């Protein structure tokens, strides 16, 4: 299930970024005594008492009319929209302000769980933070984010208010599919075409975020779930900055999926945001299919597809294992191939290699191309085994893990792929130190 989202909001310069850094344990957000330094949202996974959640740091909510302030306000309101729970930070030293009251009214309208955080309380008995009861948001939790005082109690309260961890409602063999990409590349058309073709939607099960909907269906005896289709299928109902919102939704969907369909607009090419989103799927070990949509709009000759393929491989060189489909969601050209390829890469991601066969392959690979020496030390691989699937994960027992060069690990990966395929799925290696005999 997806991690709950916790948004830190409040007016400028109350210590939101300091609290964010205190919780995640790293100085990621800019901390400066000047309103507006955190103009964009920052996202970081965090954990407390065994509960994982995604923390969002926002720019300060201000209700002035200048352009930058309006942009910050949109970002913060967007974080509120996404969040499962909100940490509303106020400055106990300055006391209650008119902006605090306006933010409080905004949060009450959002109808989300809110924890009121009275920050900058270094001495609990000397700072009167009780005025904040007027906000009607319950008891303020006094903390000093800068000093770390009482932040443990705050996190205890946060964990108590996180959404319950629901059991997985789907059959164990269900393939979860995330359709990701920038706005207006045709994600909604592809989703609607897939669901419209099947006409056997079983259920719409709410996810953790407010409007996340999973659309499940069955085809040829196989169970599928299109993860979080609400943001795509009902976009007209969402009056929010779509470009920024789409990245967050994509990352959350990737966390939950087995197969990521990365959709591009054939008329626009590949943007940095595309690389960021699909790179996240790669890092998370998800099976990936590249979908080049709107292929019907491209003027073609017999070399057009080859030119596109070459460009894609240059721009996304780290995804050389990933299949590409050229489709038109509008005309349904090659759309039936999408689920066929989903089945294929999902099977590849779950494939296992017998230990004896794997060790024979590694032995032949090292004999053909021995590991390079490093300062008179040579890497020796004693034993190999597959430790997991989704993604396929291989454990190599070696004499000196630190001298394994990336290029040689890549060589071993290519040898494994040459023999066993693993098309569409990343491969992971873990090295363990061990004394012993060569395989």
From Swiss-Prot:
GO terms for molecular function: GTP binding; ribosome binding. InterPro entries: G_ENGA, GTP-bd, GTPase_Der, KH_dom-like, KH_dom-like_a/b, P-loop_NTPase, Small_GTP-bd. Residues 4-166, 175-350 form the EngA-type G domain. Residues 351-435 form the KH-like domain. It holds the Pfam family KH_dom-like. One of its GO terms (biological process) is ribosome biogenesis. The keyword Nucleotide-binding applies. NCBIfam families: GTPase_EngA (TIGR03594), small_GTP (TIGR00231). GTPase that plays an essential role in the late steps of ribosome biogenesis. HAMAP family: GTPase_Der. Belongs to the TRAFAC class TrmE-Era-EngA-EngB-Septin-like GTPase superfamily. EngA (Der) GTPase family. Associates with the 50S ribosomal subunit. This is GTPase Der. The lineage of its organism: Bacteria, Bacillati, Bacillota, Clostridia, Eubacteriales.
């Amino acid at each position: 299930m997806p991690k709950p989202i916790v948004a830190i909001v409040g007016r400028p310069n109350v210590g939101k970024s300091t609290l964010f850094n205190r919780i995640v344990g790293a100085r990621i957000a800019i901390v400066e005594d000047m309103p507006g330094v955190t103009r964009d949202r920052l996202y970081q996974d965090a954990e407390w008492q065994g509960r994982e959640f995604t923390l969002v740091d926002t720019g300060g909510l201000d209700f002035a009319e200048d352009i930058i302030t309006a942009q910050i306000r949109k970002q913060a309101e967007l974080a509120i929209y996404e969040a499962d729970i909100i940490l509303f930070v106020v400055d106990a030293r300055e006391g209650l302000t008119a902006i605090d009251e306006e933010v409080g009214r905004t949060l009450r309208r959002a109808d989300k769980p809110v924890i009121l955080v009275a920050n900058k309380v270094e001495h609990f008995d000397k700072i009167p933070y009780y005025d904040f009861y007027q906000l009607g948001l319950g008891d303020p939790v006094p903390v000093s984010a800068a000093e770390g005082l009482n932040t443990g109690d705050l996190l205890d309260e946060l964990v108590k208010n996180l959404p319950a961890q629901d059991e997985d409602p789907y059959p164990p063999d269900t393939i979860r599919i995330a359709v990701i990409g920038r706005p207006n590349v045709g994600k909604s058309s592809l989703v609607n075409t897939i669901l419209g073709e099947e006409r056997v939607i079983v259920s719409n099960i709410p996810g953790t975020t407010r409007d996340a909907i999973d659309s499940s269906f069955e085809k040829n005896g196989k169970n599928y779930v299109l993860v979080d289709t609400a943001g795509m299928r009902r976009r007209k109902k969402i009056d929010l900055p779509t470009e920024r919102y789409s990245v967050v939704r994509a990352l959350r969907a990737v966390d939950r999926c087995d197969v990521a369909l990365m959709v591009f607009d054939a008329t626009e090419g590949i943007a940095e945001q595309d690389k960021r989103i699909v790179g996240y799927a790669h890092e998370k070990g998800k099976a990936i299919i590249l979908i080049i949509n709107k292929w019907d709009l491209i003027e073609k000759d017999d070399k057009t597809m080859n030119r596109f393929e070459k460009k894609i491989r240059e721009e996304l060189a780290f995804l050389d294992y990933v299949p590409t489909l050229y489709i038109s969601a509008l005309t349904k050209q090659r759309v039936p191939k999408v689920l066929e390829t989903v089945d294929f890469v999902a099977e590849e991601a779950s494939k296992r290699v017998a230990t004896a066969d794997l060790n024979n392959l590694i032995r032949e690979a090292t004999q053909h191309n021995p590991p390079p020496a490093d300062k008179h030390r040579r890497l020796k691989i004693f034993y190999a085994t597959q430790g997991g699937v989704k993604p396929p994960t291989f454990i190599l027992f070696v004499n000196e893990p630190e001298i394994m060069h990336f290029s040689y690990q890549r060589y071993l990966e290519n040898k494994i792929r040459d023999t066993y395929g693993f098309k569409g799925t990343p491969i992971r290696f873990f090295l363990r130190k061990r004394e012993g005999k060569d395989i």
